[in-house]
Amino acid sequence: SNTHLLNLVPDDRIKITILAGEYLPSIGSIAGSLTERLLNDMFFDKAFIGASGCSAKAGINTFDIREAAKKRIVHDNSNESFVLIDSTKFGTSTLFKALELNECALITDQYHELLASARSYQVAEPGEAPRAKGAGAAAAP
Protein backbone atom coordinates (compact mmCIF):
# COMPACT_ATOMS: atom_id res chain seq x y z
CA SER A 1 0.00 0.00 0.00
CA ASN A 2 1.76 3.11 -1.19
CA THR A 3 0.10 6.15 0.37
CA HIS A 4 1.93 8.49 -2.04
CA LEU A 5 -0.33 7.23 -4.84
CA LEU A 6 -3.41 8.75 -3.23
CA ASN A 7 -2.42 12.19 -4.53
CA LEU A 8 -2.22 10.85 -8.09
CA VAL A 9 -5.84 9.71 -8.35
CA PRO A 10 -7.45 12.35 -10.59
CA ASP A 11 -11.05 11.19 -10.40
CA ASP A 12 -12.94 11.49 -7.11
CA ARG A 13 -15.39 8.84 -8.35
CA ILE A 14 -12.69 6.19 -7.95
CA LYS A 15 -13.22 4.33 -4.69
CA ILE A 16 -10.08 3.78 -2.62
CA THR A 17 -10.02 1.66 0.53
CA ILE A 18 -7.17 2.22 2.97
CA LEU A 19 -6.42 -0.38 5.61
CA ALA A 20 -5.79 0.61 9.19
CA GLY A 21 -2.38 0.01 10.69
CA GLU A 22 0.95 1.62 11.40
CA TYR A 23 2.16 4.20 8.87
CA LEU A 24 5.71 3.51 7.68
CA PRO A 25 6.87 6.89 6.31
CA SER A 26 10.19 5.62 4.95
CA ILE A 27 8.33 3.48 2.40
CA GLY A 28 4.95 5.25 2.34
CA SER A 29 3.09 2.14 3.45
CA ILE A 30 0.70 0.97 6.13
CA ALA A 31 1.43 -2.32 7.89
CA GLY A 32 1.43 -4.05 11.26
CA SER A 33 -0.77 -6.38 13.29
CA LEU A 34 -4.01 -4.45 12.67
CA THR A 35 -3.35 -4.44 8.91
CA GLU A 36 -2.63 -8.17 9.03
CA ARG A 37 -5.88 -8.90 10.90
CA LEU A 38 -7.88 -7.00 8.30
CA LEU A 39 -6.08 -8.63 5.36
CA ASN A 40 -6.68 -12.11 6.78
CA ASP A 41 -10.41 -11.58 6.14
CA MET A 42 -9.98 -10.20 2.62
CA PHE A 43 -9.68 -12.17 -0.62
CA PHE A 44 -8.54 -10.94 -4.03
CA ASP A 45 -8.88 -12.00 -7.65
CA LYS A 46 -5.48 -10.53 -8.54
CA ALA A 47 -2.77 -8.99 -6.40
CA PHE A 48 0.22 -6.93 -7.53
CA ILE A 49 3.00 -7.02 -4.94
CA GLY A 50 6.20 -4.95 -4.82
CA ALA A 51 9.54 -5.95 -3.29
CA SER A 52 12.81 -4.44 -2.12
CA GLY A 53 14.92 -7.32 -3.38
CA CYS A 54 15.01 -10.68 -5.12
CA SER A 55 17.69 -13.33 -4.65
CA ALA A 56 18.08 -17.10 -4.84
CA LYS A 57 18.49 -17.46 -1.06
CA ALA A 58 16.24 -14.66 0.24
CA GLY A 59 13.51 -14.99 -2.42
CA ILE A 60 11.22 -11.98 -2.66
CA ASN A 61 12.30 -9.82 0.24
CA THR A 62 11.82 -6.51 2.02
CA PHE A 63 13.45 -4.41 4.75
CA ASP A 64 10.50 -4.57 7.15
CA ILE A 65 9.04 -7.65 8.85
CA ARG A 66 5.55 -6.09 8.82
CA GLU A 67 5.76 -5.59 5.05
CA ALA A 68 6.92 -9.19 4.58
CA ALA A 69 3.95 -10.50 6.59
CA LYS A 70 1.54 -8.29 4.64
CA LYS A 71 2.91 -9.50 1.30
CA ARG A 72 2.58 -13.14 2.41
CA ILE A 73 -1.06 -12.70 3.47
CA VAL A 74 -2.03 -10.90 0.26
CA HIS A 75 -0.30 -13.59 -1.83
CA ASP A 76 -1.99 -16.41 0.09
CA ASN A 77 -5.44 -14.77 -0.16
CA SER A 78 -5.28 -14.12 -3.92
CA ASN A 79 -6.43 -16.26 -6.83
CA GLU A 80 -3.46 -14.85 -8.77
CA SER A 81 -0.58 -12.76 -7.52
CA PHE A 82 2.16 -10.99 -9.45
CA VAL A 83 5.37 -9.58 -8.01
CA LEU A 84 6.37 -6.35 -9.78
CA ILE A 85 10.13 -5.94 -9.52
CA ASP A 86 12.57 -3.92 -11.60
CA SER A 87 15.84 -5.48 -12.72
CA THR A 88 17.98 -3.36 -10.37
CA LYS A 89 16.64 -5.41 -7.44
CA PHE A 90 17.81 -8.81 -8.72
CA GLY A 91 20.59 -10.25 -6.58
CA THR A 92 19.57 -8.04 -3.65
CA SER A 93 18.89 -9.56 -0.23
CA THR A 94 17.25 -7.31 2.32
CA LEU A 95 16.32 -8.36 5.83
CA PHE A 96 13.06 -10.35 5.57
CA LYS A 97 11.85 -12.98 3.12
CA ALA A 98 8.23 -12.53 2.04
CA LEU A 99 7.88 -15.24 -0.63
CA GLU A 100 9.88 -18.04 -2.22
CA LEU A 101 10.78 -17.48 -5.88
CA ASN A 102 9.12 -20.73 -6.98
CA GLU A 103 5.72 -19.56 -5.74
CA CYS A 104 5.84 -16.25 -7.62
CA ALA A 105 4.82 -14.93 -10.99
CA LEU A 106 7.29 -12.11 -11.62
CA ILE A 107 6.86 -9.09 -13.88
CA THR A 108 10.06 -7.16 -14.58
CA ASP A 109 11.80 -4.92 -17.11
CA GLN A 110 14.83 -7.07 -18.04
CA TYR A 111 15.70 -10.75 -18.12
CA HIS A 112 17.81 -12.08 -15.24
CA GLU A 113 18.88 -15.66 -14.54
CA LEU A 114 16.84 -15.66 -11.30
CA LEU A 115 13.67 -15.60 -13.40
CA ALA A 116 14.24 -19.27 -14.24
CA SER A 117 13.53 -20.10 -10.56
CA ALA A 118 10.19 -18.27 -10.54
CA ARG A 119 6.90 -20.10 -11.05
CA SER A 120 6.50 -17.91 -14.15
CA TYR A 121 7.72 -14.55 -15.36
CA GLN A 122 7.03 -11.77 -17.82
CA VAL A 123 9.52 -9.26 -19.17
CA ALA A 124 7.67 -6.05 -19.99
CA GLU A 125 9.47 -4.06 -22.65
CA PRO A 126 8.57 -0.42 -23.35
CA GLY A 127 5.91 -0.09 -26.01
CA GLU A 128 4.79 -3.72 -26.13
CA ALA A 129 2.58 -6.00 -24.09
CA PRO A 130 4.48 -8.34 -21.75
CA ARG A 131 4.84 -11.97 -22.85
CA ALA A 132 4.58 -14.81 -20.37
CA LYS A 133 7.57 -17.14 -19.95
CA GLY A 134 8.33 -20.10 -17.74
CA ALA A 135 6.43 -23.13 -16.52
CA GLY A 136 2.79 -22.37 -15.83
CA ALA A 137 3.16 -18.87 -17.20
CA ALA A 138 0.11 -16.69 -16.76
CA ALA A 139 -1.32 -14.64 -19.59
CA ALA A 140 -0.43 -10.98 -19.48
CA PRO A 141 -2.74 -9.25 -16.97
For each feature predicted by the language model, list its residue ranges.
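Conserved phosphate- and dinucleotide-binding cores of soluble alpha/beta proteins
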Residues: H4-G136, P141
